[in-house]
Amino acid sequence: SMIMNPLKSIVARYQGYILTNIQKSKYGKKLRKIKNAHKGERCFIVANGPSLTSDDLEKIYQNNEYSFGMNRIYKMFDETNWRPSFYVCEDINIFNESIDEINSIPSQMKFIPLNLHFYNNINIDDAYYFKANYDRNKDYPHSFSTEIDVQMDSRGTVTFTCINIAAYMGFKDIYLVGVDHNYHITINEDGETIVD
């Protein structure tokens, strides 16, 4: 059996408890402060697909739109004035190779899995930490997490996580740019997602 030193054991128990009860923790409280903060507004979710151009980003910048960036989006910064309002990453490999770049992205908010903060020592300045549910054994489809202060279904893509966060923040019109083709998503009054 694995013998843990007592301090590590206490920390592990505490971390497990927080992840199970994140909505009661300071992390959940911080997330709840942004619930519906952008009610009825529109935003652009910028994925890093081959269709993404610096022209797309420049338009978002010139129109002063809210936008989400993800993963290695900082590689586009040389080509555009645009910077994401919000940044999301769930990939430990990207953190391991790009922590300084990620910390220097000038976003208003960065959304990072608390799991990676606790278990992989990923520290992002002023992050909004959420509980990522990576459980792939469940046979349910990707569920839309309306309450991201409880947990986020992170078995899909980081784009999906961005949509979840945008909906939680109250954005109604969500445009996806740089995915295989551009999508427009509307969140209706019941919180249901409609893809055009």
What are the residue ranges of the model-derived segments?
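Metal-ion/cofactor- or nucleotide/acyl-coenzyme-handling active-site neighborhoods
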Residues: 2-196
